[in-house]
């Protein structure tokens, strides 16, 4: 019983961690694109 609870919460935490990492990756990618756009405007 305790094992089942532990496994369940462990899975939940893992899911939250991977979701958070995914969000950070997306945010970083958007930030990079924005920076590239600004750099292109500066060059023009």
Swiss-Prot record:
Top-level taxon of origin: Eukaryota
GO biological process: adenylate cyclase-activating G protein-coupled receptor signaling pathway; growth hormone secretion; regulation of protein localization
Any single Pfam family the record assigns to this protein: Hormone_2
Keywords: Amidation, Secreted
InterPro entries for this protein: Glucagon_GIP_secretin_VIP (IPR000532), VIP/GHRH-like (IPR046963)
GO terms assigned for molecular function: growth hormone-releasing hormone activity; growth hormone-releasing hormone receptor binding; neuropeptide hormone activity; peptide hormone receptor binding
Chief localisation class: secreted
Gene Ontology terms: cellular component: extracellular space; perikaryon; terminal bouton
SMART domains (alphabetical): GLUCA (SM00070)
Residue numbers of Leucine amide PTMs: 44
Localization per Swiss-Prot or TrEMBL: Secreted
Segment forming the signal sequence: none
PANTHER family: GLUCAGON-FAMILY NEUROPEPTIDE, SOMATOLIBERIN
Family affiliation: Belongs to the glucagon family.
Purpose of the protein: GRF is released by the hypothalamus and acts on the adenohypophyse to stimulate the secretion of growth hormone.
Protein name, as recorded: Somatoliberin
The organism of origin for this protein: Capra hircus
Biological classification of the source: Eukaryota, Metazoa, Chordata, Craniata, Vertebrata
